[in-house]
Amino acid sequence: MGSIEIPNCSGSLVYKTISDFIEFPNHEQKLWWHSTAPMFAEMLRVAGYDLHSQYKILGIFLNHVIPFLGVYPTRINNRWLSILTRYGTPFELSLNCSQSLVRYTYEPINSATGTPKDPFNTHSIWDALDRLMPLQKGIDLEFFKHLKQDLTVDDQDSAYLLENNLVGGQIRTQNKLALDLKGGNFVLKTYIYPALKSLATGKSIKTLVFDSVYRLCRQNPSLEAPLRALEEYVDSKGPNSTASPRLLSCDLIDPSKSRVKIYILELNVTLEAMEDLWTMGGRLNDASTLAGLEMLRELWGLIKLPSGMRDYPEPFLQLGTIPDEQLPLMANYTLHHNQAMPEPQVYFTTFGLNDGRVADGLVTFFERRGWSHMAQTYKDSLRAYYPHADQETLNYLHAYISFSYRKGTPYLSVYLQSFETGDWPISNFGIPVAKPLRSNISDPDR
């Protein structure tokens, strides 16, 4: 009997073709490419992106995003730790399974990140935006500029935090970018974390976020009604609630079309808590919300999140560590123009759960929805991303699963570990070169 061939994303034709012709400017960028591009290329192929789009997307990633990922992470080097993953790595792929759309998120890092010039990585995002804006029509920074000014630290704030030693083990990430890939084009989004601004000003994250968005409503009054409804729900939980605002995001497009999303972290990991997030404590009770609630309950039964109180863990996990933890729940609320109520999206925090069982639950959900291609390819894709891993024991591939329901249609996305994929474990890429080319990216402080 012949052996069963294991799918392997390092065999991707697009990845191999591009790799044959690249001259990397430094060793760090070479490592980032060979660590992440095999999985990226395979995900695009299986999702049905045409060949031209695959090359364009990976070309943009190679030339305009990888230069902003910083030094390549190892267990011993000094690097900027990003909130994006529990391992502090600044890049993550995700897949909208209902629409077969790929997205990636990254925290831009440059040579000043973590140095006295930019100790909390406030400024590097501007350089990253300068690289992306010429590549895609329609990018608009009006909302971003407003929210960033209100919710991230300036140089004076940074000096105050450092002089008074206020940060400690606090998360230092303040902003990230995400590209939703539609054909060969992309829609740009930003995520903003106000935790450091809260430390610097003494104001709560809730106060900072809602005050900033209310000021945004002065020029965009069509967003005020859903914002007020969300604030009333958050306030109704009281000062000792296990749920609290954590971050927000917005689309970097025409302000009249941009959506603002406010994210709530819920420490109480139970189906009842998730149902409360979904219905905003019963405030959302229309037919669409209730239909989505039934699917949410179905997903809960399939994924089997263990119930309990979960603080967000500190510190970051060391690379290579097998997680023995579970994260809190999360939800976001989209503020749509001219809608009275926000639209919920909930997150099943699956990091630390057995990935095989999570995949089994997802495939069952896909089959019940009639997403036959996704159901047939999903497990093979996971094996292709990490062909040398023990697929029976993995518990760190699925970081989150998000779920929303709009106009009779469920939307589900998976957020996946995207680091050292394909043949990386048996390659020479991770072996330090004897005399590496000097990187133009310095090792930032932690």
Curated annotation (Swiss-Prot):
Catalytic activity: L-tryptophan + dimethylallyl diphosphate = 4-(3-methylbut-2-enyl)-L-tryptophan + diphosphate
CDD domains noted in UniProt: PT-DMATS_CymD
Annotated metabolic or biological route of this protein: Alkaloid biosynthesis; ergot alkaloid biosynthesis
Protein family per UniProt: Belongs to the tryptophan dimethylallyltransferase family.
Binding residues annotated for L-tryptophan, in chain numbering: I83, L84, E92, Y193, R246
Protein role: Tryptophan dimethylallyltransferase; part of the gene cluster that mediates the biosynthesis of fungal ergot alkaloid. DmaW catalyzes the first step of ergot alkaloid biosynthesis by condensing dimethylallyl diphosphate (DMAP) and tryptophan to form 4-dimethylallyl-L-tryptophan. The second step is catalyzed by the methyltransferase easF that methylates 4-dimethylallyl-L-tryptophan in the presence of S-adenosyl-L-methionine, resulting in the formation of 4-dimethylallyl-L-abrine.
Protein name: Tryptophan dimethylallyltransferase
Keyword field contains Metal-binding: no
Residues at which substrate binds: R103, K189, Y191, R259, K261, Y263, Q345, Y347
